[in-house]
Structures are given as C-alpha cells and as structure tokens.
C-alpha cells in the first residue's frame, strides 16, 4: 500500500496569551518601542532613510532576529499548548520534501478565504507578476530595477538566477535565448491571469530538469477546465509616492463540454513612470484546450500572447563617478535620482535612451501535449515553440548631444530576439514498490535577424560603427540533448529512496557563415534522494547530487569576442550539492520546517560587463550555503501566522581577472532575511492580512569610468538593510463579489534592490473581484 506523510488534524488554541508578541513586533507598529533610542515622532523616524534602518542601527540585527525567532518559537512550541480535538488524518502518497510543492496559489473561486499552508493569493495587493508573489519565500532573492515591468533576470533562488534557474509553464521551459539585450527570463511576459498554482523546486536534485536548472525551477500550472462554467474578473487600481497610477485587470473563464475542456484568460496592466521615462503597459491573452481521446488519452494545446510596451529608464544623474558631486544631482527633479539603461549591445550615443525611448515586445508561447496510459504505464509528450520580437525606438536628447533638440528619431530597430523550440518524451511505470521513469529532452536555443531600419550616424558619435554593423543575422544556435532515468523505491512504510542519472550534451554552434568558435561538451550527473518518515508527523529528506549548467548563447559570444578572445575554453558549470530538510506537521495546515544546503559550483561562469572590459570566463568555483527556518501556526479560530528566517553565505575562488579584489562574494546576496505575517478573520467573513519582510545589507562591485584620459575604477558598494510592511483587507460583498483595500510599503521605507535604482514608497490601492 502506498502511504503519505501523516498529519494531525487542525487544532485551535485556547486560553493562551499572545498579546506580548504583537506589542514586541516593531515591524507591525502595533505597540511602542521599549527603548528611548527610538522615540522621535513617527514622521521623522520614517523620513530620510527609513525607520527600518534607524531601528536596526539602534537595536542591532541580533536583537531584530531574536524577535522573529520568538515568533518561530511560538510555532515550534504549539504542541505544548492546550488544543481541541484533532481532525481525521489524511493519507496521501509519500513524497520527498525537497521536491514538495511549497507554494500553492489557491483558486479564488472555490477557496476565497483559504489560509492553507504556504498559500499566497494572487488577489492580494497589487501583485502583477511572479516575483511579486514569491518575494516572501525563504530562498528567494530579488534584485529588481523597477517594481513593474522590469525585464531583467531579477529573481534568484539561493543566490543564482538567469541561466541557472528554469521557468516552466505546465512543465515546458520558457527560458529565452537571452541575446541582443533580451534576458533568459522576462517575468513581465508571465502574467497571473490564468495561474492555478506555482511550484517552487529548490536546487537541481530532479533528473527531469536539465541544463538551466542548477539553482531550481519555478513551475507555473495553469487553470484546468471545470465541470461548470466559471467566469472571474479581478481588477486593482492604485498609486502612491511619485507614481500616479498602477492598474491591473484580469479575466478568466473555464469550462468542460463533453470531451472538450478549455480555460481562457486575458489581462491588462498599466503603470505610470516612477523612474524617468519608465512607463509600462502590458496586454496578455492565453488559451489552454484539453481534448479527451480514446483509451484515456489526452491531447492538450496551449497558446499565450504577451505584449509589453515599456519606456527605457533614462539616467537621472549628472555623473557616474561617486566622488563627483554630480553623482548626487538630478537632471530631472520630477523623478528620483537613478541610473539608466541602454539599448543592447551598446554601439554609440544613439543607444542611450532619450525622451520617449521604448520597447514594444511581443511574445508567443505555443504548446502541444499528448498523454497516454498504457496499462500501468504513462507516456507523456510535450512540444513547444517560442516566438519573440521587439521593436525599438530611440529619440534625441539635448543632454546627450547639445546639437540636437529633444525628440528627433535617432534609432529604429527590429529584433527577433527568441526563436527557441524543443520537446520532451517521458515514460513512467510501476514495478511493485518501484516507480521507474525514463525520458529524453531536446532544446534548441535560437534567435532571428536584427534589422536596423534607421540610425542617425551623426548623433551616434561612434566612428567605429557603420550601419552595416547594426543589421545582422544570427551567428549561433544552441542544441541541447538530455537523457535521464530515475527509480523511486518505497523500501518500507517509513523509507523512500530515489536514485537517478542524467546525461546532458550541448553544442553552441556557429551558423550563417559566422567565424565564432563553437563550444560543445557533455556530462553525466547522478542524483540520490532519501526520505525517512520518523513519526506520523515528522519527516526528514536528504539529497546529494550533481547538476550541470551549460554556457548560454550570450556567454559564448562574449567569451569569443570579449577580452578573453576565446582562450581558455569556456567550460560548463557543475554543482556538487547536498541538502537536508526536516518538517514537523502540527495539522494539515500548520507546520515547521528546517532546511540546510551546500553548493560547490565548479568552473563558475563570470559575466563581466565593465565600461572598458567585457568578457566571460570560468573561475575555479563558487560556494553557496545556507539554512532556513519557516512555519505556520493557527493561534485561534480567527488568528493565524507564518514566519521565516534565512541565513546564507557565498564565496568565490580563482577569479584571475578580479585585479581589484574587493569582494569574494556573489553580488546582491544578503546574509539574513526575515519575513512574517498575521491573518485575522473578521466578522462577515472579512480577512485582514499584515505581512513584513526584512532584507539584510547587500554588497556589489560598481564599475565606472572617470577622468581624462579615461580610467576605469571599481568600488565596493553596500546597500542598506530594509524592512517593508504591507496590509490587505478583503471584504465579501454578496455571494459573487469581494472588495479589497491594500497598502504596500506601509511606512514609506526608502530602499534599493539593485544599486542605483530606488523603489517606490507607499502604494495604496483597491481591488474588486467578481466570480460567476
């Protein structure tokens, strides 16, 4: 008999005093600080750097962390508290905790007030994209330049991002080729309009995921057809400090008609600029069709259209030199002091954004799937295709070229930035107490032409560039094959063991007459995961494995054409990893979990893009290790809470090109992170949530040029720690509607996730949801 992790029933606490906890939580501002060091009026405390920094500097990080450990202590000590009768215990299939689904976005139609373990409602606050929803997870780090419409690789799992993590929709990868200013993952193209749940898989212990999954996988599961037709509308409107409006509207419809089922969704997002010129508008359509076939087969078709128009950020500093007073002076006083960005690759001043500089990007995701049971086996086929095009336009700025007035067209370019495609075939079958899985995967990373329709060469001021240099066909293509086999063995009622092997090969080859050197390699990576059910409520999972990360197309190009000139050979990364996870379940909803991990990434790939040095190369290794403690508790029948604390470190070795030697750590990797939240169930089925997040100081190396003749400089910068707090009130209106109000960054904390790009202050808004 297959069995599951046994959990106690939900329990209700009686007669326990918890008021002291709320008074002592400075982040919630529900009581007074006990120290005279923080007794200034609220307005002064929150001004000029944020109250979080002042509190931490006065009290110290140690005491701040202790306060949050007390909240975790409440969760851990729950069994000693008088509780009511336990509910019946559910019995489910045993799973490894490492691969457990730790984040579920509940279907608001069926569970509008759900407080399930790890549940994060996409209807909460202004949430527009996946990073908004995942920011409270212990192993997630964010380094966004803007709050809305950021197209960079802004989300990291355990310190690794970009080409080291994988984003899937229903199991198919959506990572792009990453060339010509594109990014491996553009989170703005994955709206929340048709999402049923999100699975966050930490690390690379699964054989199913290949060369982009060294750090982990974010798997988006779309909504399924329903027996009865459903129609849901959700809309938010808000604004705040220096940002006039943020709009987000979503519409979803699902239905199953005989053998044909479908889900349809559409969304629209719009945000006024917070940073100079950085407005955003997004439009999305998605359709998923399921067709039941004979012999219990299932055919699926998927289509998604995403269009985003965004203004490129204009630099709002008089100087890039931190020692120059102009570094702290703005060109435009209507917008915050901030760095800008450029059209990529930078090829002169026509690629520096002027007034109205913008992208108009359209992306299509096309999918086909077929699943067929064969006796007690299951055959699963997935095929996919990505199509992404960008229209780029830039206009003259008198601040850049004094011979031009503002607003003349200086650059018009079309970029076919992604043409990737691939597929996967997998067979799984039970043999007694064993489940065998074998599969093959193919991915082709590709892009199309870049065509410069117009460039003003006089304005561009780059004599080394000709118009012919700016229009070109793709020079490379990446072909990846993966083969894997895995056996999951239920040894006994308490032991579960999974062993697997994965073989990956890749070739980044030159095409269209390119003289770029080619890269190819292969590797075999073993995986071993063991789970022991200690008691009906206590489970431990341990894993040791290797994971591969192959160089992407941009890395291959800059390895060959950058400062290293293709010597020595660029090697793939290999992560030698170990993880340990323990979880205790108090009930079906309440739990405490401890996780520790260690990564030793050999031949870690460095991508340096300094003003006078561009190149890609291997260093000897990067070590990343850390631990987290998180949990959830139901205190009474009207109050529940969750909390998490994370400690993490990193170390790089063997960087022969780091002549400055300023840091041996990964950039933007905070040592401590803490989050917590409380949920109050109010009369009339209303729900009030308060959540808070602390992020420790982060370091990064800032490279800039100054002087005459121009010299390159490196500076180790530190971003201050910060605390943000959010509140959300949801009130049902009749049977089919809900009204919500929210405040994000409640105390107007001034903070940055990436150096030189400030985040907005207080954002206030309202939401309406209709379900039919």
Question: What kind of region is each of these model predictions?
Answer:
Residues 96-130, 154:
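N-terminal periplasmic "start-of-domain" segments of outer-membrane beta-barrel proteins
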Residues 130-133, 153-156, 167-170, 184-188, ...:
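N-terminal periplasmic accessory domains that precede
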Residues 131, 135-173:
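Extracytoplasmic beta-strand/coil segments of soluble accessory domains associated
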Residues 173-202, 328-330:
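Short acidic/polar hinge/loop motifs at secondary-structure boundaries
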Residues 234, 490-497, 505-506, 596-600, ...:
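Gram-negative outer-membrane beta-barrel transporters
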Residues 378-396, 533, 539-545, 572-625, ...:
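Membrane-embedded beta-barrel scaffold of Gram-negative outer-membrane proteins
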Residues 446-453, 507-509, 518, 532-579, ...:
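Surface-exposed extracellular loop regions of Gram-negative outer-membrane beta-barrel proteins
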């Amino acid at each position: 008999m297959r069995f599951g992790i046994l959990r106690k029933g939900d329990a209700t606490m009686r007669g326990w005093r918890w008021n002291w906890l709320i008074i002592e939580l400075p982040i919630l501002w529900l009581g007074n600080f006990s120290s005279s060091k923080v007794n200034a009026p609220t307005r002064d405390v929150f001004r000029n750097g944020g109250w979080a920094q002042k509190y931490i500097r006065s009290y110290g990080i140690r005491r701040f962390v202790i306060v949050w450990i007390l909240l975790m202590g409440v969760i851990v000590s729950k069994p000693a508290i008088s509780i009511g009768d336990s509910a019946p215990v559910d019995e489910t299939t045993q799973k490894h905790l490492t691969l457990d689904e730790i984040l579920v976005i509940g279907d608001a139609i069926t569970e509008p007030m759900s407080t399930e373990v790890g549940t994060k409602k996409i209807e909460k606050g202004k949430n527009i994209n996946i990073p908004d929803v995942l920011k409270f997870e212990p192993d997630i780090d964010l380094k966004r330049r803007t709050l809305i419409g950021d197209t960079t690789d802004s989300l990291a799992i355990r310190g690794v991002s970009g080409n080291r993590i994988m984003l899937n929709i229903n199991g198919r990868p959506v990572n792009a080729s990453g060339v010509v200013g594109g990014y491996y993952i553009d989170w703005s193209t994955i709206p929340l309009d048709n999402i049923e749940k999100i699975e966050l898989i930490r690390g690379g212990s699964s054989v199913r995921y290949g060369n982009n999954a060294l750090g982990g996988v974010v798997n988006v599961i779309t909504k399924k057809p329903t027996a009865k037709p459903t129609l849901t509308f959700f809309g938010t409107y808000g604004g705040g400090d220096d940002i006039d409006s943020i709009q987000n509207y979503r519409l979803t419809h699902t239905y199953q008609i005989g053998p044909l089922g479908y889900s349809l969704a559409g969304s629209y997002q719009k945000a006024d600029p917070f940073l100079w010129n950085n407005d955003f508008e997004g439009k999305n359509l998605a359709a998923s069709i399921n067709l039941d076939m004979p012999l219990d087969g299932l055919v699926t078709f998927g289509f998604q259209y995403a269009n985003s128009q965004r203004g490129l950020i204009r630099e709002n500093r008089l100087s890039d030199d931190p020692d120059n007073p102009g570094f702290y002076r703005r060109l435009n006083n209507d917008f915050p002091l901030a760095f800008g960005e450029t059209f990529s690759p930078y090829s002169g001043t026509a690629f520096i954004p002027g007034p109205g500089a913008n992208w108009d990007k359209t992306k299509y995701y096309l999918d086909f799937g077929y699943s067929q049971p064969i006796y007690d086996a299951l055959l699963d086929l997935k095929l996919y295709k990505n199509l992404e095009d960008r229209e780029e336009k830039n206009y003259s700025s008198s601040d850049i070229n004094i011979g031009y007035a503002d607003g003349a067209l200086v650059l018009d370019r079309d970029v076919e930035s992604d043409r990737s495609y691939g597929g996967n075939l997998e067979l799984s079958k039970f043999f007694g107490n064993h489940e065998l899985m074998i599969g093959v995967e193919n991915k082709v990373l590709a892009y199309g032409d870049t065509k410069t329709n117009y460039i003003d060469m006089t304005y561009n001021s780059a004599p080394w560039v000709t118009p012919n240099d700016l229009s070109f066909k793709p020079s490379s293509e990446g072909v990846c094959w993966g083969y894997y086999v895995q056996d999951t063995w239920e040894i006994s009622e308490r032991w579960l063991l999974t062993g697997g092997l994965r073989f990956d090969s890749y070739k980044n080859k030159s095409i269209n007459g390119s003289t770029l050197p080619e890269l190819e390699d292969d590797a075999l990576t073993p995986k071993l995961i063991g789970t022991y059910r200690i008691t009906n409520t206590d489970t431990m999972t341990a894993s040791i494995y290797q994971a591969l990360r192959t160089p992407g197309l941009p890395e291959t190009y800059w390895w060959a054409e950058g400062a290293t000139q293709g010597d020595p050979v660029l090697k793939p990364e290999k992560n030698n990893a170990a993880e340990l996870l323990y979880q205790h379940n108090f009930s079906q909803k309440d739990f405490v979990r401890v996780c520790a991990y260690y990564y030793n990434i050999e031949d870690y790939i460095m991508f340096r893009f300094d003003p006078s040095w561009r190149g890609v190369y291997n260093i000897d290794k990067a070590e990343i290790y850390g631990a987290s403690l998180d949990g959830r508790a139901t205190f009474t029948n009207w109050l529940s809470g969750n909390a998490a604390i994370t400690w993490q470190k990193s170390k790089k070795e063997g960087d022969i090109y780091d002549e400055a030697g300023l840091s041996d750590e990964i950039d933007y990797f905070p040592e401590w992170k803490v989050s917590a939240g409380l949920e109050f169930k109010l009369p009339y089925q209303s729900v009030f949530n308060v959540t808070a997040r602390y992020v420790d100081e982060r370091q990064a190396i800032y490279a800039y040029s100054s002087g005459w003749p121009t010299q390159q400089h490196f500076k180790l910068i530190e971003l201050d720690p910060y605390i943000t707090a959010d509140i959300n009130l949801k009130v049902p209106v009749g049977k089919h509607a809900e009204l919500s109000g929210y405040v994000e960054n409640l105390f107007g904390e001034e903070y940055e996730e990436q150096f030189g790009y400030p985040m907005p202050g207080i954002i206030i808004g309202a939401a309406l949801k209709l379900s039919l």
